[in-house]
């Protein structure tokens, strides 16, 4: 059990028969009445985001999520195969389970698979990934107004806004949390 006063971003808790990850929280002390903690939680099974308010000092169960380092091998129909680097055990995850993460996954990429009591919850990506540009319009000389961007399609099918000097074939660093261009690799 953990007090809601000890909430941290990224903490996983078990509340209302669900597994939740704390995305954001705020301690509130109104002029009248008792203090409370307003939180924004993401359901690890469904991916839905919900706002929930707890009384200050309320206790909730901390969920112990195990992260296993795995390598993304390949896609087989709607199943995606991952291999444990230590035991060489392979698991399959459905497309619906990792829909958002698919935009950043390439073969042989190292990821963390989140599990809770043997149940696979999803894939945790690194903060940034390197992806190659497969399609983009050429930059126009003289079009140098500040922060001019253009769309670029990456090798995974993800479309991001990039500066005009980026060309096809270049490798870019992409932030997986926001899905945005960071820099050239």
UniProtKB/Swiss-Prot annotation:
Pathway named in the protein's UniProt entry: Protein biosynthesis; polypeptide chain elongation
Superkingdom of this protein's organism: Bacteria
Pfam families: EFP, EFP_N, Elong-fact-P_C
Disulfide bonds: none
UniProt KW Cytoplasm keyword: yes
Record-level GO cellular component terms: cytoplasm
GO molecular function: translation elongation factor activity
Keywords per UniProt: Cytoplasm, Elongation factor, Protein biosynthesis
Cellular compartment(s): Cytoplasm
InterPro entries, sorted: Elong-fact-P_C, NA-bd_OB-fold, Rib_uL2_dom2, Transl_elong_fac_P/YeiP, Transl_elong_KOW-like, Transl_elong_P/YeiP_cen, Transl_elong_P/YeiP_CS, Transl_elongation_fac_P
Family affiliation: Belongs to the elongation factor P family.
Cross-referenced PANTHER family: ELONGATION FACTOR P, ELONGATION FACTOR P (EF-P) FAMILY PROTEIN
Function: Involved in peptide bond synthesis. Stimulates efficient translation and peptide-bond synthesis on native or reconstituted 70S ribosomes in vitro. Probably functions indirectly by altering the affinity of the ribosome for aminoacyl-tRNA, thus increasing their reactivity as acceptors for peptidyl transferase.
HAMAP family cross-referenced by the UniProt entry: EF_P (MF_00141)
Name under which the protein is recorded: Elongation factor P
């Amino acid at each position: 059990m953990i007090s809601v006063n000890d909430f941290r971003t990224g903490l996983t808790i078990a509340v209302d028969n669900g597994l939740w990850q704390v995305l954001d929280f705020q301690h509130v002390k109104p002029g009248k009445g008792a203090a409370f903690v307003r939180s924004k939680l993401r359901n690890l099974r469904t991916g839905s985001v919900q706002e929930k308010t707890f009384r200050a000092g309320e206790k909730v169960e901390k969920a112990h999520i195990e992260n296993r380092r795995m390598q993304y091998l390949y896609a087989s129909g709607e199943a995606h195969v991952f291999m444990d680097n230590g035991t060489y055990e392979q698991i399959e995850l459905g497309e619906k389970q990792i829909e958002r993460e698919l935009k950043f996954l390439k073969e042989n990429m190292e990821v963390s698979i989140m599990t809770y009591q043997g149940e696979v919850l999803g894939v945790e990506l690194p903060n940034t990934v390197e992806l190659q540009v497969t399609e983009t319009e050429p930059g126009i000389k003289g079009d140098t107004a500040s922060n001019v961007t253009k769309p670029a399609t990456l090798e995974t099918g993800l479309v991001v806004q990039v500066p005009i000097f980026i060309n096809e074939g270049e490798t870019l660093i992409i932030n997986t949390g926001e899905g945005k261009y960071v820099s050239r690799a």
